[in-house]
From Swiss-Prot:
Catalyzes the attachment of L-aspartate to tRNA(Asp) in a two-step reaction: L-aspartate is first activated by ATP to form Asp-AMP and then transferred to the acceptor end of tRNA(Asp). It comes from Mycoplasma capricolum subsp. capricolum (strain California kid / ATCC 27343 / NCTC 10154). SUPFAM superfamilies: Class II aaRS and biotin synthetases, GAD domain-like, Nucleic acid-binding proteins. Its EC number is 6.1.1.12. The lineage of its organism: Bacteria, Bacillati, Mycoplasmatota, Mollicutes, Mycoplasmataceae. It is an enzyme of class 6 (ligase). Residues 193-196 are annotated as: Aspartate. The keyword Ubl conjugation does not apply. Keywords: Aminoacyl-tRNA synthetase, ATP-binding, Cytoplasm, Ligase, Nucleotide-binding, Protein biosynthesis. This is Aspartate--tRNA ligase. Belongs to the class-II aminoacyl-tRNA synthetase family. Type 1 subfamily. It catalyses: tRNA(Asp) + L-aspartate + ATP = L-aspartyl-tRNA(Asp) + AMP + diphosphate. It holds the Pfam family GAD.
Length: 575
């Protein structure tokens, strides 16, 4: 029979109605002569009542059995305010077991004490948990808001190919061998970058898609080998146009999903200032903890670690807490991960100074430190010395650790900003050359146009990242549409004419036929969903993710394939 209602639908308005419900048995409780059953589906939970005369209906019934019941809705004597259906219950008149269930390998509750690989192995069970279903519901809502908003602004949703050409820039590609074209490979795209720019040349002036992308890179909590982007591009538009639409869209999402208001325009911070103040190009602004440079305070110091300070920076973070020995040791271990031996620290409480450097401080330095950090009653200063980039990274990481130690990362608070004025190039130690910091189609800023290819160290990109709560959730740029500038860019990243023609000739040919200026952005929808659901990992907002080693624990992919399949592809494996 067809269900008349879901398990999250019945209210007092349905009292005395005969209903049919279908779902999974969540819990069975005996109370005197009666038995109570919690029946669940993705919409909620309804309490069922089995009276004494119908007790035979539940012989051998167990948790996670799939059942169908028919019964009468009645008002509950004791209301359960945690449930939408908490004012009613259903007196069961008939019950059918649709399918039985074995004992599940872990309890299907929101708080579950089981390792993640077990959850991923039985992902279909893990997804029965309400918290996981809510994550997918919120993710679907975000997608729905995006589609409605962009469609109303005349954006056209266009699909681009998954089988593409491998190009030399960016992260590693996943390669797909072609059976029909021996010894040749497709690449799964890291983004639809070139295709969306071709759509601009095609006259599709406002494009978007919610698209799967692929990168063969090391994994972490906010990365997967396959991930989902909102990809967006606009013709006859500048960076400002893209940023304005992005701000309005993220404002709408936060309002409708979290009932959280943000003010436009968002804060803008240059890449240089982000590194200087927060040690990161994706700073979490839910807490202060700015990084300070203390070279002036210690310039004539006799402190041994600061004697050799030429071309080095003394940088510090201060928190109005007194760190314990255990907490300081945690920061020491973190410093070693950044190739520092340890951290130095200074504690002050009611003008009493202690710590690894306290005895070596002059009274003048103490006064300067109090003024520098605006210390009131107590504080701990964490500091070290090193090359600017390295010490800034360390202090940025320590800043985050301190926030976690003292619960400064406020839940349901969302701090957004734009990081702008990125370097156009970054130096690759591995390749011993400058490479494009984003991709070679990012336009230099106007002030860098004259010499970006000869002054690579200082060249700035017309690029922008959208940051929320310490995560980069979007990144975009103004694109190069001038063939002369594009050629200079290829030369700057040491791609010769033969390489350009082989890898990008098909793309560059399109620019011979009239290209509008255009700009765009890509949002990481997995990361946005992770933040808005307060999840610990993007794996918790993806239905069937890979684990931290890139393995699908259910199907054991990737896996070996047969020799016959390899022969068809003209591939041999090497042990």
């Amino acid at each position: 029979m067809k269900r008349t209602h879901t398990c999250g639908e019945l209210t007092l308005q349905n009292v005395d109605q005969k209903v049919i419900l279908q779902g999974w048995v969540k819990k069975i409780r005996k109370l005197g002569a009666m038995v109570f059953i919690d029946l669940k589906d993705r919409y909620g939970i309804t309490q069922l009542v089995i009276e004494q005369e119908n007790i035979n209906l539940i012989n051998n019934l167990k948790n996670e059995y799939v059942i169908e019941i028919s019964g009468i809705v009645v008002k509950r004597k004791s209301v359960n305010k945690e449930l939408i259906t908490g004012e009613i219950e259903v007196i069961v008149k008939d019950l059918l077991v649709i399918n039985k269930s074995e004992l599940t390998p872990f309890v299907l509750e929101n708080d579950v004490n089981v390792n993640e690989d077990t959850r991923l192995t039985y992902r279909y069970l893990d997804l029965r948990r309400q918290v996981m279903q809510n994550n997918l519901i919120i993710r679907a809502k975000i997608n729905h808001i995006i589609r409605n908003y962009l469609t109303d602004l005349n954006f056209l949703e266009v699909e681009t190919p998954y089988f593409a050409k491998s190009t030399p820039e960016g992260a590693r590609h996943f390669l797909v061998p072609s059976r029909l074209n021996k010894n040749k490979f497709y690449a799964l795209p890291q983004s639809p970058q070139l295709f969306k720019q071709l759509l601009m040349i095609s006259g599709i002036d406002r494009y978007y898609q919610i698209v799967r992308c692929f990168r063969d890179e090391d994994l972490r909590i906010d990365r997967q080998p396959e991930f989902t982007q909102l990809d967006l591009e606009m013709s006859f538009a500048t960076s400002e146009d893209v940023m304005q639409i992005s701000e309005s869209l993220i404002k709408k999402i936060l309002k409708e999903v979290k009932n959280f208001e943000i003010k436009e325009p968002l804060l803008r911070l240059s890449y240089k200032d982000a590194i200087d103040l927060y040690g990161s190009d994706k700073p979490d602004l839910r807490y202060e903890l700015k990084i300070h440079t203390l070279n002036d305070i210690f310039k004539n110091s006799d402190i041994k670690m600061f004697l050799d300070s030429q071309n080095k920076y003394i940088r510090a973070v201060c928190i109005d807490q007194l760190l314990t020995k255990k907490q300081l040791e945690e920061l020491n271990q973190q410093a070693k991960q950044f190739h520092f031996n340890s951290i130095a620290f200074i504690k002050v409480e009611n003008n009493a100074w202690s710590g690894s450097l306290a005895s070596q401080l002059t009274e003048v330095q103490k006064k300067q430190l109090i003024e520098e950090f605006n210390i009131q009653n107590k504080a701990t200063i964490i500091l070290n010395i090193g090359k600017y980039e390295e010490i800034s990274q360390l202090m940025g990481a320590i800043r985050i650790s301190l926030a976690k130690m003292f619960n400064l990362e406020t839940k349901d608070d969302f701090k957004l900003l734009w990081v702008v004025d990125f370097p156009l190039f970054e130096f690759s130690e591995q390749e011993n050359r400058y490479v494009a910091a984003h991709h070679p189609f990012t336009s230099p800023k106007e002030e860098s146009l004259a010499d970006f290819d000869t002054n690579k160290k200082d060249a700035l990109a017309c690029a922008y990242d959208l940051v929320m709560n310490g995560f980069e959730i979007g990144g975009g740029s103004q694109r190069i549409t001038n063939s002369e500038i594009q050629q200079r860019m290829f030369d700057a990243v040491e791609l010769n004419q033969k390489q350009v023609e082989a890898n990008f000739g098909w793309f560059m040919n399109a620019y011979k036929y009239g290209a509008p200026y255009h700009a765009g952005i890509a949002w990481g929808l997995d990361r946005i969903s992770m933040i808005l659901t307060d999840s610990n990992s993007i794996r918790d907002v993806i239905a069937f993710p890979k684990n931290s080693l890139g393995i699908d624990m259910m199907s054991n992919a990737p896996d070996l394939v047969s020799d016959k399949q390899l022969d068809e592809l003209n591939i041999k494996t090497v042990e």
